[in-house]
Amino acid sequence: MLPLRDDNPTHHRPYVTLLLIALCAVIYFVVQPTPFASTTADARFEYRYAAIPTEVVHGSPLSTCAAASGILGVTASAAGCKQPGSIVPYAPAKHTRLAIITSVFLHASIIHLLGNMLYLWIFGNNIEDRLRPVGFVLFFVAGGIVATLGHVLADPSSQIPVVGASGAIAADRKSVV
């Protein structure tokens, strides 16, 4: 059974909550490769814009060979890389620290997006009401950053992109309790 709302009254319209939901939806449906795109196109997008633990730790983008092996799900040599340690960056313009924030707004699937947005709607309006719009945005982004960094600490060598607002929404849920 999924909740659709809560019983906590709010005193203000949750404009920021609605804006965050709209932003995540627009990014998923307009900016990210379509759900019908190949998984390779989606993976390429995620490797360019999502936080990747090993990149966050080292402060530099993955090499082309490391990203290719991650996108294809094979070893670097099977991906056609003769020198697995190649230092040519896959996404040279990628700002690995900024990706910690941008990854909060990316989602892996429609179910991932809908689940996160449902819980953002249920809990976000109460937090926004309490913290006011600017405080809520700061709290939401801080929750996403802390969750992403927690993921990085749990597996700092991971080359798998971290996406989704689950950490930011978990912070919202915990603050309601």
What are the residue ranges of the model-derived segments?
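A detector for small-residue-rich transmembrane helices and their helix-helix packing motifs
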Residues: 1-177
